[in-house]
Structure formats: structure tokens, C-alpha cells
């Protein structure tokens, strides 16, 4: 994956991990995918999300995260999609498939709606 300071962040760019942090409450390493666009704003949006998700899986399962961040190497991983709004109900099967695939690799997928400042 590319240096995040050289590449734009967001679901539209699968070449960069948008954010890596840790969650002390769960012990998980959290890889965040950022989606600031509303759903259906881009015809290829779900394909872009799929490409980003697959890139994150490769980053973790291919050992790249552990090489780049040795302290995270043996920690549980959560991939978190921070999005502008809840996914559409008609896309539920897509998100369920992603979650099931991640779970089969011992990775948790979480979808979280970003809070906007009032």
C-alpha cells in the first residue's frame, strides 16, 4: 500500500489504508475505510468498496501490516467502514458477504456512520 500522505484517502482509492489505529477496549487493530460520499453518488461505489476491502485483506493476510507495524502483528484485526450514512437496505447482501468473508479469516467487519458536527 502507498504512503497515505501521498495518496488521497477514501473508498475510491484502494492503494492506501485510510487510517490505522488500535482499540484499547477490544485489543483490536482497526483499519478504517473512509466513505464520505452518500450511497449511490457514484455508479461504481460498491465495486470501489470491494476493491478497497480486498486490498485491506491482502494488507493484513499477506503479512504487510505486521511488517510495517510489528507491534500489531499478532493482534486481532477489525476492518471498519466509516460512512456518511447507513448503507442502503438493498445492499445488505453485499455487506453480509463482506462480513462473512472477513469472519472466515478471523477479521471483524464493522460499518459505522460518521457523526457530523452540528
Predicted regions span which residues?
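Short glycine-rich, basic-tinged beta-strand/loop micro-motifs
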Residues: 29-37, 72-85
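Helix-rich interaction surfaces within compact, conserved domain-sized segments
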Residues: 78-118
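Ordered, soluble secondary-structure elements with a strong preference for glycine-centered loop motifs
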Residues: 40-47, 89-92
Amino acid at each position: 500500500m502507498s504512503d497515505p500522505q501521498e495518496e488521497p484517502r477514501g473508498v475510491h482509492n484502494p492503494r492506501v489504508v485510510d487510517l490505522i489505529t488500535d482499540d484499547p477496549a477490544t485489543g483490536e487493530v482497526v483499519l478504517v475505510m473512509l466513505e464520505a460520499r452518500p450511497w449511490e453518488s457514484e455508479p461504481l461505489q460498491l465495486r470501489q468498496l470491494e476493491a478497497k476491502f480486498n486490498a485491506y485483506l491482502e494488507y493484513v493476510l499477506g503479512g504487510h501490516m505486521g511488517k510495517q507495524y510489528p507491534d500489531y502483528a499478532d493482534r486481532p484485526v477489525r476492518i471498519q467502514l466509516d460512512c456518511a450514512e447507513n448503507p442502503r437496505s438493498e445492499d445488505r447482501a453485499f455487506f453480509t458477504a463482506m462480513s462473512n468473508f472477513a469472519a472466515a479469516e478471523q477479521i471483524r467487519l464493522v460499518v459505522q456512520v460518521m457523526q457530523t458536527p452540528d
